[in-house]
Amino acid sequence: MAAGIRGRRLSAPLKPRPIASDAERFGYFKAGKMGLGWLVECDNAAQAETLRAAYPTYATLVPAYLSPYKGVYSSTFVRLPFPVFKEDWEAIESGLKQAGIQVPDKVRNMGHEAIRRAHERFLLSKLPNFGADAGGGYATGFLRDGYAPLPFQGVAIEYTRKMGYRGIIGDDMGLGKTMSGICVLFNASQGRKLIVTKNSLTPSFYARLKEWTGKTESEMAVAVSATGKARKGPGKHPGAHPEWLGLKKYNVPFDADIDRYEVLIVHYAILKKWLPRLLEWKPEAVVFDEAHTLCNPDSLLTQSARRLSEQVDSVVAMTGTPGSNRPRELFHLFDLVFPYRFGDFHHYGLRFCDAHLVKQPRTVFNKETGQRETKQVEVMDYDGASNLKELFYRLRATGMVRRLKNDVMAQIPFEDIPMVLPVSDEYWAQEEECVRKVQEARSKGETESLLSKLLLLAAEEKIKWASEWIPDFLENRNGPLVVFFHHNSVGDALREFARGKGIKTMCLYGNHKDDDFEHRFQTDEGVELALVSYAIGRDGLTLTRSAHMLLLEYSWVPGWIDQAKDRLRRYGQERLISYYCPYLEGTTDERVVECVVKKKDVLSAVMDNRSDTVLPHFGSM
């Protein structure tokens, strides 16, 4: 068909012309009752009839009075609509093939784009309105007087209820997912209920349940790995009481009778050990708190959680960072709550993880030579990201509710303060030597330990600066300072330094875990410094007595940094929060930050349908 024809009627008939290629057969048509679609020019009336008869549901012959070539080809044009579903497009393409017409790439691409847009509109129509009040479809009678979920929390409860009490509550950190999870738990079941969380958060969950629902020690307990059997040694006797075992009164040993409890709280470290007992106990509803812990399908922990979720009617996962690192993690979290909702992982990876074959070095044993050799082998790489908007819609429409702080509450102001640190000649020499070793080891696939050494070198260099900056900061600022880091050796160095300066310090890292850390930090005005590692203290804690945080090291996982920062940016915080972000310019330390910012931009597109502008120096961290 001639270019430029858009369904207009010609004033005079044109003579027949030869069709040079299949690409000339297709014209974009939009006019009156004809609607939107392709107008396909056929060689003759017989071919047009063959095309129309191949699928009468879709194809129509163009009436003579609407033919672009008036009076010439009145019956050799066939109108095909833009497809809405993949099956429609396959039927249209099959019919064209039967008529001897090949579909040009341009037409095929436009067809696929039409399908994508139609699918996006369909998903958008199913997207729940998370900003509206949910109404009164759920019960709150189990809560004590004076306690009730906020309207936006009610939306999450109602949405999960409509999904059959299965769902992912992915609200931003600090938005009260604990209240939402407890309400879903008690709405879903009148019988036994299970909460699985991190060890450091079990006392907090127990306290909230007791405060909000009025449950007593006879109705709920926290599971521990210890047993009630007698121990060897003087003064030890059988029939031990929990107090004798060094346990709190609400703890229940592994070999205790748990049938009398309505609510049981188990932490992830002992889930595998407790799994047989929990399956016998037969809970009717389970909440997985901090569910991003369950994103590794090969771990025994995730496999135990999967076995448990398959035996329970109601399963709710709660996490402020549903995708801590890459889109591939979302599949395993969704598959835990909604088995097979996304099909198999490989097809998910092809669609949303930009899966492709890459060559990687692998050490293999050569039987002929009796030695180990390094070979390049092809493996499937699922670490990428693709079709993020479609993934966002599918997540929201099929089981996940997520709101950011700015969506549901007055914005808590905060600022990222980048701090460029001087780099010593000694550090430059050490980094140069380490980089050289990394390049040599790259072909052998042995770079991981050397990269860790590079990061530790940067951390040690920043400790020298921190030992001068922290005392000046505490002297001139109001309120305590929270320091986050990755390596335990960094915490040890800061702890010894603070002790020498007489700075009252609390620790939560490695082997240094102060009892009742959160409560003491929030109430003891004498505490000036808190040393916290990402591994232990990045989630669940409320540290709103401080409005200042020093991110001395950066995690490879952007979700960990967000979790750490949200220890201060929570309900109850009324001051401007300052995050101090020191980095060694031009070094590996700065390149780590660039990598983390790019990762976070991808995750923002998936989880929140937005792509943050990557600002220089921590603008979107």
Protein language model features and the residues they cover:
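Charged, low-complexity
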Residues: 5-6, 10-17, 27, 38-42, ...
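Conserved helicase/translocase motor-coupling segment
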Residues: 406-504
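A conserved SF2-helicase RecA2
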Residues: 556-621
